[in-house]
């Protein structure tokens, strides 16, 4: 079960590994917390399209359905409203979040439908964002909060009664999409091939934090699904500039420089070995697990 804030997040974070697991027979459910109603239209070709501007939420639901089809995942909505990303004015004053938005919903109220889904789908592995939301968008931070709360509560019959039989996932991971080691590897690969690196400016302003080095616990090989990832991302046409520089790095360059998607193991109720994992189901697979379970995520 991959818990995301907005439609398109599932295609920019963990998409290739999700597609790989689907190809291996794993059931993967993407949970999208909001409809992305307050997102901007980032594709210049659609920025003034009347059909898009008339009902962005409906347009993004169509995009999400297409991306899910490409990845092969199941997908459902929690039904909350996008909080938007407030920007400070010239005096540095940040406007309040809009009333009724996802970020302002009380924690247990926002968590209840996710607990219901966990108990219904019965995943063995969950993925979500870290405590910073991956980046400090209020909906991403809220997604982290409800994911952690649901992971801890779903197996406890005394919590959230009336939402199904208790079910305890075995592991929970944070996405580590944009960490320094990966960006450096891709940046250096671009330079070696004479390609303009889209990561140069990002790395110049990078602030190293000692604790970040320990975050990388799991690298899932999934290079064969990078093209699927990009196709799913481009399905979110309002959110992606198809001519953007991110798509200028050849897939083969990416595959050779960094052939994995990466995660941080945040919670585990199964034994964890030493070193870097190469499978989200390490310790949960029938051949290594303490209990014989089928695989779902």
Predicted regions, residues:
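Active-site rim/loop-helix segments in enzyme catalytic domains that contact anionic ligands
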Residues: 1-122, 264-267, 272-273
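Metal-dependent de-N-acetylase/amidase catalytic core
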Residues: 1-3, 88-297
């Amino acid at each position: 079960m991959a818990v995301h804030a907005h439609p398109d997040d599932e295609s920019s974070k963990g998409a290739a590994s999700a597609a790989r697991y689907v190809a291996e027979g794993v059931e993967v459910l993407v949970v999208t917390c909001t409809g992305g109603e307050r997102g901007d239209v980032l594709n210049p070709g659609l920025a003034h399209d009347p059909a898009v501007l008339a009902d962005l939420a409906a347009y993004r639901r169509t995009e999400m359905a297409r991306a899910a089809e490409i990845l092969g995942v199941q997908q459902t909505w929690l039904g909350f409203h996008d909080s938007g990303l407030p920007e400070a004015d010239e005096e540095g004053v940040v406007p309040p979040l809009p009333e009724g938005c996802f970020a302002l919903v009380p924690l247990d109220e926002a968590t209840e439908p996710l607990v219901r889904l966990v108990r219904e789908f019965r995943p063995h592995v969950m993925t979500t964002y870290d405590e910073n939301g991956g980046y400090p968008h209020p909906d991403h931070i809220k997604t982290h909060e409800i994911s952690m709360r649901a992971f801890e509560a779903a197996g406890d019959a005394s919590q959230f009664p009336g939402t199904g039989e208790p079910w305890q996932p075995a592991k929970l991971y944070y996405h580590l999409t944009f960490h320094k080691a990966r960006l450096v590897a891709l940046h250096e690969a671009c330079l070696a091939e004479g390609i303009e690196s889209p990561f140069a400016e990002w790395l110049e302003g990078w602030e190293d934090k000692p604790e970040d080095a320990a975050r990388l616990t799991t690298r899932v090989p999934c290079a064969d699904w990078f093209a699927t990832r990009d196709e799913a991302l481009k399905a979110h046409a309002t959110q992606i500039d198809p001519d953007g520089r991110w798509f200028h790095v050849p897939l083969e360059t990416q595959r050779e420089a960094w052939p994995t998607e990466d995660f941080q193991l945040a919670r585990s109720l199964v034994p964890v070995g030493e070193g870097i994992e190469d499978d989200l189901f390490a310790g949960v697979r029938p051949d290594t697990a303490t209990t014989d379970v089928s695989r779902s995520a």
